[in-house]
Structures are given as structure tokens and as C-alpha cells.
Amino acid sequence: SNLFTRSGAVWTQQQDVYMEDLTINVNTYLESNGYRIFVRGTLTNNGWIRNDGHDGGAGIANAAGSGGDGGHGGSLAAGTDGSGGGRGGWEQGGTHGGGGGGAGGTGGTIFISARTLAGITGGIRVEGGAGGAGGTLLP
């Protein structure tokens, strides 16, 4: 089975990986996808290893935005999904308040075991998604 799938500069893990050495180049992203990374020798990270949450959806008119998905969980715990926003209120006379944007999902978990970590330009990131924008007021 394949360890990774690739789309442009983004490599996505499909299972736990056991590597002798692993190098992530500049301007390259490894989406850990909630799986573990074991490196017997050196992990050289000049790109990004990440498992971010996803952004919440925007409110539309007086309808609530949806919550964003949490970071992926493969063999590790997934991030928590964000909750949906509230519906816009209604005032006598017909004015509707805008719906609230959904909350972003939390980042997932990253697990790395390596004898040596190297690289000066890379990073490891588990970041929550942004909240969605509120909807517009309706007359």
C-alpha cells in the first residue's frame, strides 16, 4: 500500500510510516493526517509537517455557518470539529439579523519519533481553523 499521496507540493500520509531517514524539502508540506512518523536516523525538515483544523463556514443572510472539521485522526486522536454559528434573530417589523459564522475546528495530533531532528527553515504545526464570517442583515 502507498505510504503517501501527492498533490503538487503537498504529501499526505496514508498510514503510520517507518523510515530510515526522511527529508522534507523547502516549500513542501507533509500532512500527517493523524498518523505517526517514526524515523530511525535523521528527520530533516525544511518544509512543514502539519495537521491543521479546517475553517468554519460563513453565515449566509440569517442562516448559520457550519463548523469546520478538526484535524484528521488516523492512528492518533483527531481534532475537535467546530460548532455551527447561531441563526440570525428576527425583529418585529421584518428585519433579520445576520447568521453567525461557524467555529473553526481544532488541530489534530502529530507524533514524531526520530533519533535526530535537523533543518533550519521548516516547522511543525497543529493549528485551529479560522471562524467563518457572519451573514448580512436582511430588511
PLM feature spans:
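Glycine-centric low-complexity/flexibility signal
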Residues: 1, 34, 40-139
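Extracellular beta-sheet-rich ligand-binding/adhesion modules
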Residues: 1-42, 109-114
